[in-house]
Amino acid sequence: MQHLRFLHYIDAVARCGSIRAAAEKLHVASSAVNRRVQDVEAELGTPIFERLPRGVRLTAAGELFLGYARRRQADLDQVRSQIEDLGGVRRGQVTLAASQALAPAFLPQAIHEFQTLRPGIAFDVKVLDRERAACAITDFEADLGLIFNPPDLRGLTVLAQARQRTCAMVAPDHPLAGRASMRLKDCLAYPMALPDSSLSGRSVLEDLFEQSSAQPHPPLVSNSYEMMRGYAREAGGVSFQIEIGAGPSAGAVAIPIDERRLPTGRLVLVALRDRVLPVAAAAFAEFVGARLKEANQDGE
């Protein structure tokens, strides 16, 4: 499969934006990578990279060829996975792009439980904002995406989804910690840590505050849920998290927000449209899909 290695070279150059950087990443000589690029351009009869003073940039023809190269590599990964499964070898890797809200609790637990069933499966998890997570799927950088409030689903297939309510996160010794639920106005008396606009949870909270006519003045805004949770714990304040990501956490208690017509967010499991997933990724998609279905039923 020597020709697929050449396609891998092209993909690396496109991702790095430089022949030299791609060669360093691939641990080969720059001349070897440049030669493969030139071979492809000669065969196609057109440049696939525009040479710039610092690096290279894909041409329109290069964009088309890169899509072909990535589809070929994805097809090969899927075939390899199926062959291993036929032989009774339960190995493989799942590459997942996920929203940050799922990183502290839900994903570690789900992956661990899945690996107890299929211990040969390894995971490569990329925690990204929702726009980059969607792009990781379409760019063949990830098999699956688990994204909260995705901005655009063009080119993607929704495999499973769940509506998500908002929870307040407080320290175990916080005055609100013993409540079964709470109103948003109850939070205003305490320092609040809110997500910044790069996190999809911010738009849900803005809708929630607008609905309740609350005017928050947060002393901390961050793009990190761990930072917000840690600050709230130290300051005796409140941070926020979607319910599926608000599982048991060291030093934090989750309390559901109880508001009329409470705005909810949408958590979706997605894959590239028309792509046949590798066996390991398909199995994990089925496993997580069942978890999301349970979350929907629990929220009804």
Where are these regions (language model features)?
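Short helix-boundary/capping micro-motifs
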Residues: 11-29
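Conserved amphipathic alpha-helical core elements
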Residues: 40-41, 114
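A short LG(V/I)-centered, amphipathic sequence patch enriched
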Residues: 41-58, 63
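Central regulatory/effector-binding core of bacterial HTH transcription factors
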Residues: 91-154, 221-224
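Hydrophobic hinge/microswitch elements
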Residues: 129-134, 138-142, 147-148, 198-256
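Beta-alpha-beta core module
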Residues: 153-160, 164, 179, 226-276, ...
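Flexible hinge/capping segments at coil-to-helix
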Residues: 153-192
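Secondary-structure junction motif
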Residues: 191-212, 277-287, 292-299
